[in-house]
Amino acid sequence: MATPMIAGAAVAAAAVAGRYGILAWQAFKARPRVPRMRRFYEGGFQSSMTRREAALILGVRESVVADKVKEAHRRVMVANHPDAGGSHYLASKINEAKDMMLGKSNNSGSAF
């Protein structure tokens, strides 16, 4: 006598769970698309800075104009300035990247 009641309750619970599962899936598929976070370069620094590495550090393309390089340099330096708790090493690499992109430096002038 109790077995049919337990079986009925189990079927009802499965039906309710299935219904809410389907509703949750439909809500998930209908959600607005949120842009994903931008992926950053995960590698380390090269022994001699190249134009490609400088562009990766500043977050610009290799064929960018000088104004965009200066804007990117300012944005990255604000986030990594030593006076705001950033690293002196990173600040020197950011400055070196700006010089490389602007054509002021051919070889690595970094002390690190």
UniProtKB/Swiss-Prot annotation:
The gene is TIM14-3. It is found in: Mitochondrion; Mitochondrion inner membrane. One of its GO terms (cellular component) is mitochondrial inner membrane. SUPFAM superfamilies: Chaperone J-domain (SSF46565). The modification N-acetylalanine is found at residue 2. PANTHER family: MITOCHONDRIAL IMPORT INNER MEMBRANE TRANSLOCASE SUBUNIT TIM14-3, PTHR12763. This is Mitochondrial import inner membrane translocase subunit TIM14-3. Component of the PAM complex, a complex required for the translocation of transit peptide-containing proteins from the inner membrane into the mitochondrial matrix in an ATP-dependent manner. InterPro entries: J_dom_sf. The keyword Transcription regulation does not apply. Residues 53-112 form the J domain. It comes from the Eukaryota. Belongs to the TIM14 family. Keywords: Acetylation, Membrane, Mitochondrion, Mitochondrion inner membrane, Transmembrane, Transmembrane helix. The chain crosses the membrane at residues 6-28. The keyword S-adenosyl-L-methionine does not apply. It is a single-pass membrane protein.
